């Protein structure tokens, strides 16, 4: 009963105003601006003691507020944006589904096979390293009898040396000096049996000597003197 009475009062107040169906935002903004001016006028009238004008402004303000309230009641509820979203997209409590990952994991055998293929994919020496090794030092070490002798052949910066060890503990050396320090040596079996040396001087002198097993040194030399 009371609600019907309020609706009837609203209709009576809205008799001189535009119907709610033709209301626009500009019209609502005009009412809001007018209400602001009415409030300021009411405060001014109260300060100045103008009671009649204050009551008239209050009645006008109340009328405008009732009209705006009636417009708000006549508008349909705006629930359309909420209904646009499907219900299955709403967040639901509960554990999340996790897909199985067993197919993505690798067993230890496949990991070992992949590691082996990566280790043996490249050769031990590159072609550049093989070429450097071929032009570098060439060594041959065949095993001998007795004390494990070695023989080597090396070519390095113009110097050639060849040495071989016998079955004994020590070996002598034969040196031939031709101005460029290139030596050719041979050692026989036995310990300190003998050594011979032959040297050719650049000036034309030759000398030869022999050392016997007793340690004596015999020197036989011939020198060519200019006439």
Swiss-Prot record:
Tissue specificity field: Expressed in shoots, aerial roots, ears and tassels. Expressed in the shoot apical meristem (SAM), young leaf primordia, leaf margins, inflorescence meristem, floral meristem and spikelet meristem.
Disruption phenotype: Dwarf plants with narrow and small leaves, reduced number of branches in the tassel leaves, fasciated ears and sterile florets.
Coiled coil segments of this chain: none
Gene Ontology CC terms, in alphabetical order: cytoplasm; nucleus
Keyword entries, A-Z: Activator, Transcription, Transcription regulation
Location of region: Disordered: 186-227
Classification via InterPro entries: SS18_N
Pfam families on file: SSXT (PF05030)
A Gene Ontology BP annotation from the UniProt entry: cell division
Physiological role: Transcription coactivator that plays a role in the regulation of meristematic function in leaves, stems and inflorescences. Regulates shoot architecture and meristem determinacy. Binds to the inflorescence architecture gene UB3 (unbranched3). Regulates the expression of several genes involved in inflorescence architecture. Component of a network formed by the microRNA396 (miRNA396), the GRFs and their interacting factors (GIFs) acting in the regulation of meristem function, at least partially through the control of cell proliferation.
Subunit and partners: Interacts with several GRFs. Interacts with GRF10. Interacts with GRF1.
UniProt family annotation: Belongs to the SS18 family.
Protein name, entry field: GRF-interacting factor 1
Gene: GIF1
